[in-house]
C-alpha cells in the first residue's frame, strides 16, 4: 500500500505536521506493509512554460533537470500515479489556498490527467498515448489549516482542494479543517486537531483497503451536499441551486426539523464532477464546442487587429527584456 502526502505549506509547518500525523496513523492502520512518501509543493520546479500541460510519456524518470528551467512535473505525477491513497494539505492564505497548489493543479493535473478523456483515447485505439495507471482506483483525504478562529476567513480552502484531483476520478473519503493555527506549532498544541488528523489517517487506510475489496465510501463529516459534503451553493435561477464545490444540481428546502437542506436526486447528482457521469457530460460539452464552424474572415480580421494592439501595448517585465 502506497500512501502519498502532498503539502502546500511550509517545511515543518502546521500543514506538514498535520499530514505527518495522519500519515503515521495510516501506516499503523494499514493491513499490508505501507510505503509513505511526502512531497512539498514549494520545492517543485515548474517553469512558466509548463502551463501547456505537455508531459513526456511515460512519465517515469522523465523529470528534466537540464533545461533552462527544471521541470519536476513528471516526478510528482509519477508519485501520484503510483499512490493508492493521497492526503492533500494546504494552509489558508487570504481566505483561499496558496498559489503553489493552484500552479501544481493547472500545470500537472486538470484536463491533462482526465480519466474520462483517457478512456476515450483507449476506446479509439490510442491507448499508447495514455499512462494506464490513470485508471487505478485511489482514495483521497483533504486537510486545511488557517490562523483565524471563525469560518468566514476560510470559505474557499476545502472547496478549492476538491478541484485538484477530481479529473483523476480519485474518491474523497475524509476531510478536515482546522482553525486557530496562525503561529508555528499551534497544530501540535491543539490536541483535538491532532486526534482528528490521526482519525483521518486511519480512515484513509481503511478505505484504501476497501478499494481492493470493493468500493470505498466517504466516512468524514457530513455536509449539506450529499456528494462532496460541503455547504457552498450557487443560486442559478428562481429555484435552481448548484453545489459550488462539485456541481450537483437541486433546490433548497426545509426539512422536517425546520432546518434548510439541499434537495437533489439521482439526475441532479449525475452532474457532480465527483461522479464519472459529470466528467462525461463535460466532455460532451467540449466536443460540441469543437464542432462549431471555423472562424470567418471578419473574425480573423478582428483577431489580427487585437493582436497588433496587444503587441504595441504589452509591457514586458525585466526578465523578458523589459526595462
UniProtKB/Swiss-Prot annotation:
Keywords: Flavonoid biosynthesis, Flavoprotein, FMN, NAD, Oxidoreductase. Disulfide bonds: none annotated. GO terms for biological process: flavonoid biosynthetic process. Pfam families: FMN_red (PF03358). InterPro entries: Flavoprotein-like_sf (IPR029039), FMN_Rdtase-like_dom (IPR005025). Its cofactor is FMN. GO terms for molecular function: oxidoreductase activity. Pathway: Secondary metabolite biosynthesis; flavonoid biosynthesis. It is an enzyme of class 1 (oxidoreductase). Its EC number is 1.14.-.-. Disruption phenotype: Results in the accumulation of intermediates that all bear a hydroxy substituent in the C ring and lack a double bond between C2 and C3. Gene3D superfamilies: 3.40.50.360. FMN-dependent oxidoreductase; part of the gene cluster that mediates the biosynthesis of chlorflavonin, a fungal flavonoid with acetolactate synthase inhibitory activity. Within the pathway, cfoJ acts as a flavone synthase (FNS) and catalyzes the formation of a double bond between C2 and C3, converting the flavanone into a flavone. The pathway begins with the PKS-NRPS hybrid synthetase cfoA that uses benzoic acid or p-hydroxybenzoic acid as a starter unit with four rounds of chain elongation using malonyl-CoA to form the chalcone skeleton. This is Flavone synthase cfoJ. It comes from Aspergillus candidus. The lineage of its organism: Eukaryota, Fungi, Dikarya, Ascomycota, Pezizomycotina.
Amino acid at each position: 500500500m502506497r500512501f502519498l502526502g502532498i503539502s502546500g505549506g511550509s517545511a515543518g509547518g502546521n500543514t506538514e505536521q498535520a499530514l505527518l500525523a495522519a500519515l503515521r496513523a495510516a501506516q499503523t492502520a494499514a493491513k499490508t506493509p505501507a510505503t509513505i512518501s511526502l512531497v512539498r509543493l514549494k520545492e517543485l520546479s515548474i517553469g512558466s512554460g509548463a502551463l501547456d500541460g505537455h508531459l513526456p510519456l511515460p512519465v517515469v524518470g522523465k523529470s528534466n533537470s537540464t533545461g533552462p528551467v527544471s521541470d519536476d512535473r513528471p516526478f510528482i505525477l509519477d508519485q501520484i500515479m503510483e499512490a493508492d491513497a493521497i492526503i492533500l494539505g494546504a494552509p489558508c492564505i487570504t481566505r483561499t489556498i496558496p498559489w503553489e497548489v493552484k500552479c501544481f493543479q493547472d500545470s500537472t493535473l486538470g484536463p491533462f490527467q482526465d480519466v474520462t478523456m483517457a478512456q476515450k483515447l483507449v476506446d479509439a485505439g490510442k491507448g499508447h498515448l495514455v499512462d494506464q495507471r490513470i485508471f487505478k482506483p485511489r482514495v483521497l483525504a483533504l486537510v486545511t489549516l488557517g490562523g483565524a478562529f471563525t469560518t468566514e476567513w476560510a470559505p474557499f480552502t476545502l472547496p478549492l482542494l476538491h478541484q485538484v484531483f477530481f479529473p483523476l476520478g480519485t474518491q474523497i473519503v475524509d476531510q478536515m479543517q482546522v482553525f486557530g493555527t496562525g503561529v508555528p506549532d499551534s497544530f501540535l498544541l491543539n490536541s483535538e486537531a491532532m486526534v482528528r488528523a490521526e482519525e483521518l489517517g486511519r480512515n484513509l487506510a481503511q478505505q484504501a483497503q476497501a478499494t481492493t475489496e470493493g468500493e470505498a465510501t466517504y466516512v468524514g463529516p457530513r455536509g449539506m451536499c450529499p456528494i462532496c459534503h460541503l455547504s457552498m451553493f450557487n443560486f442559478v435561477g428562481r429555484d435552481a441551486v448548484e453545489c459550488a464545490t462539485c456541481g450537483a444540481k437541486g433546490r433548497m428546502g426545509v426539512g422536517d426539523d425546520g432546518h434548510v437542506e439541499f434537495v437533489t436526486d439521482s439526475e441532479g447528482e449525475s452532474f457532480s464532477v465527483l461522479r464519472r457521469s459529470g466528467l462525461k457530460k463535460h466532455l460532451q460539452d467540449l466536443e460540441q464546442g469543437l464542432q462549431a464552424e471555423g472562424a470567418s474572415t471578419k473574425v480573423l480580421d478582428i483577431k489580427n487587429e487585437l493582436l497588433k494592439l496587444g503587441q504595441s501595448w504589452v509591457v514586458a517585465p525585466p526578465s523578458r527584456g523589459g526595462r
